[in-house]
Amino acid sequence: MEKNLYEQDYYLWLEKTIYLLENHQFSDLDLENLIDEIKSMSISQQKALKSNLIVILWHLLKYLQEPEKQTRSWALTLFEQRERIEEDLENSLSLKSFLTEDNLKKCYNKARQKAAIETGINLEKFPKDCPFTLAEALDFAFIPNQNQSI
């Protein structure tokens, strides 16, 4: 398969690649670009999981810092992000290996920055260490105790 096709007409490249795979014409495949696409899909799955977790942690921090300002949209956002993670894990069990304490810390640091920017509250007022466990973050019923000290 011409490597130029990938750059010239991506959709046609996809269609041709599918055809070649379905017809076991492996020697005609553009393996270099096919491998890159598969790697990219893997990275995309991890990025989506990370993004959803950041949004969850960000909103949980808002519940802690500004409980009086909570809205239904916060609860809806938490539900939607948790639902996305749940669906991703149901479809790809191996993604669960991405949900580590180390990645929780990384996501928390980004969520902390976002919460500070959105609320206008000094970053130092938010806990340096994540006050939530991974289980709490993913638990559909979990909303931080509004009396919880931070």
Per-region residue spans from a language model:
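Surface/interface-facing alpha-helical segments and adjacent flexible terminal/loop regions used
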Residues: 1-54, 58-150
